[in-house]
Amino acid sequence: MTQTVHFQGNPVSVAGKLPQIGDKAKDFTLVAKDLSDVALSSFAGKRKVLNIFPSIDTGVCAASVRKFNQLAGELENTVVLCISSDLPFAQSRFCGAEGLSNVITLSTLRGADFKQAYGVAITEGPLAGLTARAVVVLDGQDNVIYSELVNEITTEPNYDAALAALK
């Protein structure tokens, strides 16, 4: 399945299907900042916010990580996973420089299948190969309780709606 989002107003195709409310989240294995493999199942029993974005080295993506880091400190039994195509070194450098410790960064470095499975694989245009901007919120049993594929990649996600799903 292919969906369309926009980058600076221009349409770009995104492969796969974003999980929808009521779906069971597919397990995945991504790469942590220490280069270890981390699976969704590593966070069993916890609620999860998947903040998915193209690159931590862009202003909007960096802003989303900062915002979710701030919000994560207020959430009980919840982990915020910030997922991008960046190398784990870049993710670690950014969070270290910014003093961000409430989120967990994960890279698609060895988990390219995640992009297709979660419907965020940008397949054309200048961002081809990166992940589209999306937020998926899971309950403690990995059921999707909120899902947003951001239409314009250069805008931030709807933080309030994502948080409302956790209330």
UniProtKB/Swiss-Prot annotation:
The keyword Phosphoprotein does not apply. The active site is at C61. Its EC number is 1.11.1.24. Keywords: Antioxidant, Disulfide bond, Oxidoreductase, Peroxidase, Redox-active center. It comes from the Bacteria. The keyword Acetylation does not apply. InterPro entries: Redoxin, Thioredoxin-like_sf, Thioredoxin_domain, TPX, Tpx_CS, Tpx_Peroxidase_subfamily. Disulfide bonds join C61-C95. It catalyses: a hydroperoxide + [thioredoxin]-dithiol = an alcohol + [thioredoxin]-disulfide + H2O. CDD domains: PRX_Atyp2cys. One of its GO terms (molecular function) is thioredoxin peroxidase activity. Residues 19-167 form the Thioredoxin domain. Thiol-specific peroxidase that catalyzes the reduction of hydrogen peroxide and organic hydroperoxides to water and alcohols, respectively. Plays a role in cell protection against oxidative stress by detoxifying peroxides. The active site is a conserved redox-active cysteine residue, the peroxidatic cysteine (C(P)), which makes the nucleophilic attack on the peroxide substrate. The peroxide oxidizes the C(P)-SH to cysteine sulfenic acid (C(P)-SOH), which then reacts with another cysteine residue, the resolving cysteine (C(R)), to form a disulfide bridge. The disulfide is subsequently reduced by an appropriate electron donor to complete the catalytic cycle. In this atypical 2-Cys peroxiredoxin, C(R) is present in the same subunit to form an intramolecular disulfide. Belongs to the peroxiredoxin family. Tpx subfamily. Homodimer. This is Thiol peroxidase. It comes from Yersinia pestis.
